[in-house]
Amino acid sequence: MQVNRDLGAEFAAMLAAAEWDVALLQECPPRFAEPLARACGAAAHRALTARNSLGALRAAAARLNPDLIASAEGGSNLTLVRAAGSLGGIAERRELVIHHGRPERRTMALTRTAAGLCVANLHASAHRPELAAADVQRAAAAATEWAGEAPLLFGGDLNLRPDADGAVFEQLRERFGLTGFTAPGAIDHLLARGLDAVDPPRHWPPRRREIRRDGLALRLSDHAPVEGRWLIPYPPRLDDASVNSAI
């Protein structure tokens, strides 16, 4: 079911009801950052990506006719860290442009939590696996250097599939120590370094990502959320810290 109206409240309700400590969102309208953070009791780190010139005008058009403007509203990578969770909020925010120019500007949000966990949130180039591979490898090099010895969660829409782009995932493991993927044919992934996996990344089942409107099922995104759970084996600040993450 498709409706031509703003769905910010529905996104906020679904995200707030889910269980997580850190959430990584891509292609998120920039105006959603504050309402989502408030609804979830979270601190936010927003990194703008593409199509964000004249942002106020784009946002106004999106409120009036979301279907007409669609992704032309502008985008961002948004990382949310629940202040009351085991990660203790956000201690440091950085961002890095990982792809300049055509086809689109791509950025990565780098977030260090108060518990010491580092989070890299990115959206790699679409429809061009060679560009996506370059984006992801550049991002992994920067993220691991920035994180140092701290545990790292590296995730987002990588636009790479392990069954077709296996060499890239092997390089991520060998060069950067980043392991784990969602499924062989998936493009949304949560990879980890220095974390003990409790529940490996997996897609939400279809019914979990649907809401009911007028007796019909409405999906808020064409991407199924991915969630996983890890333990921080040596938390720098908190004892028995864990990470429950979703993208």
Residue spans for each PLM region:
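Acidic/histidine-rich helix-loop elements
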Residues: 1-7, 56, 125-130
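A conditional alpha-helix N-cap/helix-loop micro-motif detector
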Residues: 3-8, 101-104, 132, 136
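Structured beta-strand-rich core segments of catalytic domains in phosphoester-bond hydrolases
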Residues: 4, 28-115, 203-205
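Active-site beta-strand/loop signature of hydrolases that rely on acidic residues for catalysis
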Residues: 11-36, 119-122, 138-166, 191, ...
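Short beta-strand micro-motifs in enzyme catalytic cores
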Residues: 76-78, 105-109, 118-120, 187-189, ...
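Metal-dependent phosphoester-hydrolase catalytic domains
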Residues: 88-91, 97, 130, 144-152, ...
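Surface-exposed cleft-lining segments at the edges of enzyme active sites
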Residues: 93-101, 120-132
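Alpha-helical scaffold elements lining the catalytic groove of polysaccharide deacetylases
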Residues: 127-143
